[in-house]
Amino acid sequence: MSKLSQPATTPGVNGISVIHTQAHASGLQQVPQLVPAGPGGGGKAVPPSKQSKKSSPMDRNSDEYRQRRERNNMAVKKSRLKSKQKAQDTLQRVNQLKEENERLEAKIKLLTKELSVLKDLFLEHAHSLADNVQPISTETTATNSDNPGQ
């Protein structure tokens, strides 16, 4: 059985160190690990492919730079238009909801008045029925029960 050797640390860029280890005797290959170089972890570990793009500044007169700027400007313009449209849609929805709220409040007032009128009619009718009903006395009931045929 073979043992792994001690990992070798290579100083990297952007505060990142790359740890290399030797492969097993079986021929398995290990992938280098990206770790922060400092004890504070001074940044995110970035793969080398991403690091190379950041390290070389682009010439402002190059075609690639102009194309990137143009694409970025178009994206910003599109984003701002989308944001404006969303704000307009929201404002329109707010106005629709306000109008609907006013209609509903008017309907509530109308229905409340109608309920009040109906309650008054009901109470008036109930009182008139109560006034028309004569109290039944015990004498009348006794007389009617003695003469069931009449």
Curated annotation (Swiss-Prot):
The gene is Cebpg. Residues 56-72 have a biased composition (Basic and acidic residues). It comes from the Eukaryota. Binds DNA as a dimer and can form stable heterodimers with CEBPA. Can form stable heterodimers with CEBPB. Interacts with ZNF638; this interaction increases transcriptional activation. Residues 27-94, 129-150 are annotated as: Disordered. Belongs to the bZIP family. C/EBP subfamily. Residues 66-93 are annotated as: Basic motif. One of its GO terms (cellular component) is nucleus. It is found in: Nucleus. It comes from Mus musculus. Residues 134-150 have a biased composition (Polar residues). Ubiquitous. GO terms for molecular function: DNA binding; DNA-binding transcription factor binding; RNA polymerase II cis-regulatory region sequence-specific DNA binding; sequence-specific DNA binding. Residues 28-37 have a biased composition (Low complexity). Signal peptide: none annotated. This is CCAAT/enhancer-binding protein gamma. Residues 62-125 form the bZIP domain. Transcription factor that binds to the promoter and the enhancer regions of target genes. Binds to the promoter and the enhancer of the immunoglobulin heavy chain. Binds to GPE1, a cis-acting element in the G-CSF gene promoter. Binds to the enhancer element PRE-I (positive regulatory element-I) of the IL-4 gene. Binds to the promoter and the enhancer of the alpha-1-fetoprotein gene. InterPro entries: bZIP, bZIP_sf, C/EBP.
